[in-house]
Swiss-Prot record:
Its main location: membrane. Keywords: Cell inner membrane, Cell membrane, Lipid biosynthesis, Lipid metabolism, Membrane, Phospholipid biosynthesis, Phospholipid metabolism, Transferase, Transmembrane, Transmembrane helix. It is an enzyme of class 2 (transferase). Its EC number is 2.3.1.275. PANTHER family: GLYCEROL-3-PHOSPHATE ACYLTRANSFERASE-RELATED (PTHR30309:SF0), INNER MEMBRANE PROTEIN YGIH (PTHR30309). It catalyses: an acyl phosphate + sn-glycerol 3-phosphate = a 1-acyl-sn-glycero-3-phosphate + phosphate. This is Glycerol-3-phosphate acyltransferase. Catalyzes the transfer of an acyl group from acyl-phosphate (acyl-PO(4)) to glycerol-3-phosphate (G3P) to form lysophosphatidic acid (LPA). This enzyme utilizes acyl-phosphate as fatty acyl donor, but not acyl-CoA or acyl-ACP. It is found in: Cell inner membrane. It is a multi-pass membrane protein. GO terms for cellular component: plasma membrane.
Length: 192
């Protein structure tokens, strides 16, 4: 089982490294999202640069990158902590994709996929919090920064063995949003 765990962490990282924003931009003749708009290879920037259709495809692809490795690990009866670490590897792949010179997105949709596979009520909480914050503030980064940590108390209560990997995942997402935090504090953050 140890070998299978390491195989799945590697698989999760490599799957996470597939950047749907970059691939869909190339296939549709659009500019690289890392060099346009907000500079982020994610669904929100794709919405700004390429419209709803490609943004939805990016969102679904990124979500599946987090969900698929968790479903495989669950099918193999790996414990929830192992599944959580496998999910962290999928998000690390999204943040630092080996196929795209380690320049990726911020990991929010991939993390949502991980949560969906690990503990669906936590994913539902994150999605509702994200949508509500986006509706009230029209700021995607603030929505991510609020929604992601909100899942931790629920996980601590219901799935405590997933708390450590999901705390690491949360810290990674907050770290990737550090520029957005600076812009939020300075009143310069982009709105929808």
């Amino acid at each position: 089982m140890v070998r299978m765990f390491w195989l799945l962490t590697t698989f999760a990282y490599l799957l996470g490294s597939l950047s749907f924003a970059i691939l869909l931009s190339r296939l549709s003749g659009r500019p690289d999202p890392r060099a346009s708009g907000s500079g982020n290879a994610g669904a929100t920037n794709m919405l700004r640069l390429a419209g709803k259709k490609l943004a939805i495809l990016t969102l679904l692809g990124d979500l599946c990158k987090g969900l698929v490795p968790i479903l495989i690990a669950s099918t193999l009866s790996m414990d929830i902590a192992q599944q959580g670490w496998i999910g962290v590897c999928a998000v690390l792949g999204h943040l630092f994709p080996v196929y795209f010179r380690f320049r990726g997105g911020k990991g929010v949709a991939t993390a949502a996929g991980v949560l969906l596979g690990l503990y669906p009520p936590a994913a539902a909480l994150a999605i509702v919090a994200w949508l509500l914050t986006l509706y009230l503030t029209r700021t995607s980064s603030l929505a991510a920064l609020i929604a992601t940590p909100l899942t931790l108390p629920l996980l601590a209560w219901q799935e405590p063995h997933a708390l450590l990997p999901m705390s690491v995942l949360t810290l990674l997402i907050v770290w990737r949003h550090r520029g957005n935090l600076r812009d939020l504090l300075a009143g310069r953050e982009r709105h929808f």
